[in-house]
Amino acid sequence: MASTWAIQAHMDQDEPLEVKIEEEKYTTRQDWDLRKNNTHSREVFRQYFRQFCYQETSGPREALSRLRELCHQWLRPETHTKEQILELLVLEQFLTILPEELQAWVQEQHPESGEEVVTVLEDLERELDEPGEQVSAHTGEQEMFLQETVRLRKEGEPSMSLQSMKAQPKYESPELESQQEQVLDVETGNEYGNLKQEVSEEMEPHGNTSSKFENDMSKXARCGETREPEEITEEPSACSREDKQPTCDENGVSLTENSDHTEHQRICPGEESYGCDDCGKTFSQHSHLIEHQRIHTGDRPYRCEECGKAFRGRTVLIRHKIIHTGEKPYKCNECGKAFGRWSALNQHQRLHTGEKHYHCNDCGKAFSQKAGLFHHIKIHTRDKPYQCTHCNKSFSRRSILTQHQGVHTGAKPYECNECGKAFVYNSSLVSHQEIHHKEKCYQCKECGKSFSQSGLIQHQRIHTGEKPYKCDVCEKAFIQRTSLTEHQRIHTGERPYKCDKCGKAFTQRSVLTEHQRIHTGERPYKCDECGNAFRGITSLIQHQRIHTGEKPYQCDECGKAFRQRKKTSYKEILLKNHSEPQAGVNLLLSSLIPEWQSCFRKDL
């Protein structure tokens, strides 16, 4: 009764208080406190709407009215457009389908749209080595502990029932944060255990979802409030892992033996939140706010002593230093190859598993790495942004341009560790190294040459004379499928490889490449004996026969040998078939494109 008189006395003196008391006739005190916090009220009302209980109302009409009110408070149609409301619904479903480990963390960032969620997850993958996938690599003990933390987070989320919220314990969030510290220590190891704060700062945390929800409640339910014994007995038993544990002096929160009591007191509910003046985000710790503000100011105080590159967070600098130290802590169990980043190991393991997550929308081709898809797309767009300053030739990849420039500079950066021989292109080095890796190569029993497994199969057809790929038009057979494909372009007239300089087209890419060297002046194939250089490898091989004296081509009539195979003219085709002239004509016509065939057949 005394409290009633006190309120009445203030009503005459303080008009705003009178309005507040009138409002409390229709809403709970917790509702009113939540409305004062505009930053997180939308999320609170969404949870109210989704978990509203029919039993909380006196009848169906009141229930429907209450649902409409909560939906209106959540979606705010008076201030949001239809597109914005749809985005809120899509955002809600997007957060729902995320894995539990990522879902809880993303919700702490309070994203405003689906694009912000994507940005947060991509930044997490890029900066923190895909921690969602690190979870799957934990030991059994770590996995069980992480699952327990997720379960505690779920149980720590406040019920959306208006009645049950009053009885919701106010000390679950700090315990969850203590549990999360232990999980982080398990993940990163003792060496990086002290960097928990920097790791969380790099992720720009805002505190977990339940703690944000609790901070919006009235101060009457915070640490200093005196609670009845029956409220404590209603605490879920799952939130207390042991009967006797150290507790917080302020609110009785149970702490594990390894949790930091000082850290808990600093984040205990009742402490002020720190808001960013630029974007409005709030943080439970001032250090988190300072770290976040560097995004707006561009400040990067952590600088690498080796290369001078600067970073916003200390943990990113530590990971960067691995580049200079050469440390590769992540090792593949299949082949033993080591990597400096977890994400690099994860991408590499897809080579063993055959996983290809990235698909091209134009042709359907799949890739195990995003970079592979990115470079592949340039084939369809014909984008070649990297241009050589010496010959103005353009390339789709920077790495290919770098290799090409070695033709002008004479640089051969790819050196064989076995014999020291250097090459301009990495592909040339890989082909060369097969010579040394005898244990991984397959040797031809006929001539002793070594090949890869597929290369040996094709090579053996030279000795057996097998030519399984046959042309349907002229019945000419080939050892390789690629040779048949190139040959068929003679009949179809297709010349897909066109020179950008003069417009001349060719049936083979290799012929186009060799032709383009006429314009650029490149002669990458050099003779070791006399120093003469050539545009094509075949020209170099033919030239080298001058020094070796080799003459592999022999005449069937007289037995005379030659260094080069003479090209057969159309006249010789007819002369060779003089006994059957029609057969010679048919063979000659079959080598022409269809348009020419029809023209010549009319004259015959």
Curated annotation (Swiss-Prot):
Regions annotated as coiled coil: none
Gene Ontology CC entries for this record: nucleus
Region (Disordered): 154-175, 224-264
InterPro entries referenced in this protein's UniProt entry, alphabetically: SCAN_dom (IPR003309), SCAN_sf (IPR038269), Znf_C2H2_sf (IPR036236), Znf_C2H2_type (IPR013087)
Zinc finger map (C2H2-type): 274-296, 302-324, 330-352, 358-380, 386-408, 414-436, 442-463, 469-491, 497-519, 525-547, 553-578
Alphabetically ordered keywords of this record: DNA-binding, Isopeptide bond, Metal-binding, Nucleus, Repeat, Transcription, Transcription regulation, Ubl conjugation, Zinc, Zinc-finger
Location(s) in or outside the cell: Nucleus
Gene Ontology terms describing biological process: regulation of transcription by RNA polymerase II
UniProt crosslink position (Glycyl lysine isopeptide (Lys-Gly) (interchain with G-Cter in SUMO2)): K20, K25, K196
GO molecular function, one term: zinc ion binding
Superkingdom to which the source organism belongs: Eukaryota
Domain SCAN box: 46-128
CDD domains xref list: SCAN
SMART domains, A to Z: SCAN, ZnF_C2H2
Function: May be involved in transcriptional regulation.
Family classification: Belongs to the krueppel C2H2-type zinc-finger protein family.
Protein name, UniProt field: Zinc finger and SCAN domain-containing protein 12
Species this protein is from: Pan troglodytes (Chimpanzee)
Gene name of the encoded protein: ZSCAN12
